[in-house]
Every structure is written in structure tokens, then in C-alpha cells.
Amino acid sequence: KFTLWNRITAAVVSLIAAVTYLVTIEPTASFWDCGEFIASSYKLEVGHPPGNPVFQLFARLFTMFGDNMHAAVAVNAFSAICSALTIFFLYLTIVFLAKRLLRPSEDGTYSVGKAIAIFGSGAVGALAYTFSDTFWFSAVEGEVYAMSSLITALVFWAMTKWYEQADQPYANRWIVLISFLMGLSIGIHLLNLLAIPALVFMYYYKQRENGHYSLWEYVKIFLVSVVILAVILFGIIPYLPKFAAYVDLFFVNRLGLPFNSGAAFFMAALLAVCFLGMFRTMKQQKVFA
């Protein structure tokens, strides 16, 4: 019954957050980027750099359920729902941490007192964040921070699921999901990339769960996370599109081919390299190659 009550408590906490945010959403637009995000989402136009295409696509989906006079309310409601789901995954993450502190009995079950303490910890932590000023402020307006928070919470929760199942077959599917979500998050807000160091630390902690790390080992783990973050932030994000543009210029100006043919070739070549690498690593059984 622990799992059942855990799910019920998570649902109740997220429902409280959803009702609170939907009741208090902005009726129109707040006086900053929200008006731009609402308009660009409704018309699927280009927002200010670096852009938020994933957010705009989902926000546009919500605006399709009403007329143009209620587009702002629809986008604000989308933020409210994203924030409520953030609270849901935050609760589950806190429960995961509480279970690490309160160990079950020898038969693998929790006593009533420990279960109440675990559920209470998750509920108090999640509801405290629900009604915090900064999060509530962003939860009721058409901004990217609500969806960004959801992806961050979802990624960290997925890492806890991998942590619990790391020794089981196909546990690395959670790593694949995390990689996919981190890729999507680039189209929402770059703030999500700051979750990478925490994920790297969790991965290394699992490799030596009952051991200890020296100070130098902590430094090396931190440096690994910084390198991964830097490669994505300063390498992949700016230079992949730039290189695609150079290839397109070469195809159009030098080879006389139609516009966007170079970009299409670049994307096809990039996908081919990715699939080739995937098949080779599968053949050689190198999981994290």
C-alpha cells in the first residue's frame, strides 16, 4: 500500500497546485516578455533570441482550444498546468530522498510512522514550493519558466528512477530519456542545462554507493560535469546551426543548388553519423560509448 498512498498523495499535492494556479492566472498578459510569448506562440512567429520553439509549439496547442480573444488565458493556463506537474515530480523526488534517510524494515516494508514521515516530507516540501513567491509568480503567466521548471523536475525525477533501477536490465533507458529531455529543453530555456552537474554527481554516486570519494575525486567529477555543460552550451548549440549555414552557403553559392539544400544535406549527414555510431556501439556492446 506504500506505493498506492504515495501516488494518491502526489496526485492530491499536484491537484492543489493546479487549482491554485488556475484560479489565480493572469487574465491577459503581464508587463514584460509575456505579451511577446503569447503573441509569438499564437501566430508561431519568431521570438527574441535564443528562441523558444518547443515552448511556442506547446503553447500554440493550448490556444487552439479557444478563440483569439482568449489566447492569453490559454497560454497562462498552460504555464499553470506545467507548474502543477512540476510540483508532482518535485514531490516524488523528495520522497526518493526521504526514503534514502528512512530505511525500510528487513522485510522491505515501511512502518506507519515512517510512511507518514516520508509522505509528509514530500507534501510539505512540494507545497512550500507551490506557494513560494517566485514560483507562484511564474506559474500564472505566459512565460517559459514554468515549462522550464517542469523539464528540470522531470529530468531529475528520471535520474532518481535510473538510480533505483541501475542494476536492472534496460535501466539505461532512463539515461536515454534524460538525454532526449535535455535536448528538448534547449528549445525552452538554457537554464535547464544547469541540471547536468547534478546528474553527473548522481551517476558517480551510484557507481560507488557504499564507498567514499576523496576531495580530488569530487573535483574531477565536477570538472567532468563542467566539460559536458561547456561542450553543449558553447559548442553544440551555437556551432551546429552555424556549420549548417556554411554548408548551405556552399551548396547554393558554389554548387548552384536550391536554397536549404545544404542544410538538408547537413541534417541527413548528421543523422547518418548518429545512426552509424549507434549501430556500431550496439554491435560492440558499448553502452555509454
Question: Which positions does each model-derived feature cover?
Answer:
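Transmembrane signal-anchor helices characteristic of membrane glycosylation enzymes that use polyprenol
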Residues: 3-30, 129-131, 189, 232-233
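Transmembrane-helix motifs of polytopic, lipid-linked glycan transferases
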Residues: 11, 77-110, 154-158
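Short hydrophobic alpha-helices at membrane interfaces in multi-pass membrane enzymes
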Residues: 120-123, 165-183, 213-227
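Aromatic- and kink-enriched transmembrane "portal" helix at the membrane-lumen/periplasm boundary
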Residues: 22-23, 68-76, 104-118, 122-149, ...
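Start-transfer (signal-anchor) and selected internal transmembrane alpha helices
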Residues: 1-20, 109-123, 269-289
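Membrane-interface transmembrane helices that cradle and orient dolichyl/undecaprenyl
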Residues: 110-116, 155-175, 203-213, 273-278
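Transmembrane-embedded, aromatic-rich helix segments that form part
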Residues: 151, 191-204
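Extracytoplasmic catalytic/substrate-binding loops of multi-pass membrane glycan-assembly enzymes
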Residues: 25-37, 47-59, 70-73
